[in-house]
Curated annotation (Swiss-Prot):
Name this polypeptide is given: Alpha-1B adrenergic receptor
Keywords: Cell membrane, Cytoplasm, Disulfide bond, G-protein coupled receptor, Lipoprotein, Membrane, Nucleus, Palmitate, Phosphoprotein, Receptor, Transducer, Transmembrane, Transmembrane helix
Region (Disordered): 295-331, 385-417
Membrane topology: Multi-pass membrane protein
Species assigned in the record: Canis lupus familiaris
Length: 417
């Protein structure tokens, strides 16, 4: 729509014929109405998010969101299709003239359906959001939490609307923690409140940009004496277009989530891809460890899907503590040995005696080869002395005898190595 409107303003006349002029005018009303109704739907969504923050995922489902989007476009089509069906003023004799339909009753109908009714819904929803946010903030700030150490009871007191006290008590045996519950509620409410503030800015700019046009259009159509000059009408007409340029600026500046979404949509991820490739080159090798197999050993993993660089369980250039592997029943009751330090070097192979010793089998399972649990992890190569400037990875010397050793934080069962 916008390129054709710009061509009309620059050239001063319409060059695409009468039929395309009618289509352009209808599509212009369709897109503007869909934009305004979308803000109306978002305001309802924000009210639900603030009023029912904990129940929001169950109230607003994917299916309901799709139905809301379909409703927005169906209503927009109903409002905009009138001129294509003949509900318009007589066409001028000159095909080089083209503009929005100024038929009085259609102008009134489209103004009510496209702007004034959605605006009333938006204002009502935001008044409700403000009331709920103010009341909820006051109640959460006035809430008093106590912990009785002797009886191990947790008491949460929240002053509600009629200033009565609701006491919620639970014991540790039940595993319910009111403090964690109120923390979740505070987090969700603050997030929804911030989103509502962002949308409030958007709605404010929407009113400032569209209100002059929807005042000038119906008044100029119904009363010829109140029709504004062409220059004024063009200014208010393009002011409505300008609102669509503001929204992509307001959303990222007010919300990190929207900013990340815009960056992802625009495809500005080249820098992130380069960083990930650099981490893969410098981060060592991916290995697979099968702890309870007969002859359990460390194997070089060939699948990128098993690499912890993609799953976020390993950071390049630093060490991450790996979770301890649970021992088999055959090892229960034995004292856990100190962690063995391992280091994997791409060009250096560890002696086979260290990596291929058979692991003891749990009772009743001898003679069987059970794959057991699979642990995939990344052993980051340690650099040697500072003088080694070639970037090669060398084994770290063992603290006891100066021999090359390995380094990891995962404790191994006795007799595994």
């Amino acid at each position: 729509v916008l390129p054709f409107s710009a061509a009309l303003e620059v050239l001063g006349y319409w060059v695409l014929g009468r039929i395309f002029c009618d289509i352009w005018a209808a599509v212009d009303v369709l897109c503007c109405t869909a934009s305004i109704l979308s803000l109306c739907a978002i305001s309802i969504d924000r009210y639900i998010g603030v009023r029912y923050s904990l129940q929001y995922p169950t109230l607003v489902t994917r299916r309901k969101a799709i139905l809301a989007l379909l409703g927005v476009w169906v209503l927009s089509t109903v409002i905009s299709i009138g001129p294509l069906l003949g509900w318009k003023e007589p066409a001028p004799n000159d095909d080089k003239e083209c503009g929005v339909t100024e038929e009085p009753f259609y102008a009134l109908f489209s103004s009510l359906g496209s702007f004034y009714i959605p605006l009333a819904v938006i204002l009502v929803m935001y008044c409700r959001v403000y009331i709920v946010a103010k009341r909820t903030t006051k109640n959460l700030e006035a809430g008093v939490m106590k912990e009785m150490s002797n009886s191990k009871e947790l008491t949460l007191r929240i002053h509600s609307k009629n200033f009565h006290e609701d006491t919620l008590s639970s014991t540790k045996a039940k595993g319910h923690n009111p403090r964690s519950s109120i923390a979740v509620k505070l987090f969700k409410f603050s997030r929804e409140k911030k989103a509502a503030k962002t949308l409030g800015i958007v709605v404010g700019m929407f009113i400032l940009c569209w209100l002059p046009f929807f005042i000038a259009l119906p008044l100029g159509s119904l009363f010829s004496t109140l029709k504004p000059p062409d220059a004024v009408f063009k200014v208010v007409f393009w002011l409505g277009y300008f609102n669509s340029c503001l929204n992509p600026i307001i959303y990222p500046c007010s919300s990190k989530e929207f900013k990340r979404a815009f960056v992802r949509i625009l495809g500005c991820q080249c820098r992130g891809r380069r960083r990930r490739r650099r981490r893969r080159r410098l981060g060592g090798c991916a290995y697979t460890y099968r702890p309870w197999t007969r002859g359990g050993s460390l194997e070089r993993s060939q699948s990128r899907k098993d690499s912890l660089d993609d799953s976020g369980s390993c950071l390049s250039g630093s060490q991450r503590t790996l979770p301890s592997a649970s021992p088999s029943p055959g090892y229960l009751g034995r004292a856990a040995p100190p962690p063995v330090e391992l280091c994997a070097v791409p060009e250096w192979k560890a002696p086979g005696a260290l990596l291929s010793l058979p692991a003891p089998q749990p009772p009743g399972r001898r003679g069987r080869r059970d794959s057991g649990p699979l642990f995939t992890f990344r052993l980051l190569a340690e650099r040697g002395s500072p003088a080694a400037g070639d970037g090669a990875c060398r084994p770290a010397p063992d603290a006891a005898n100066g021999q090359p050793g390995f380094k990891t934080n995962m404790p191994l069962a006795p007799g595994q190595f």
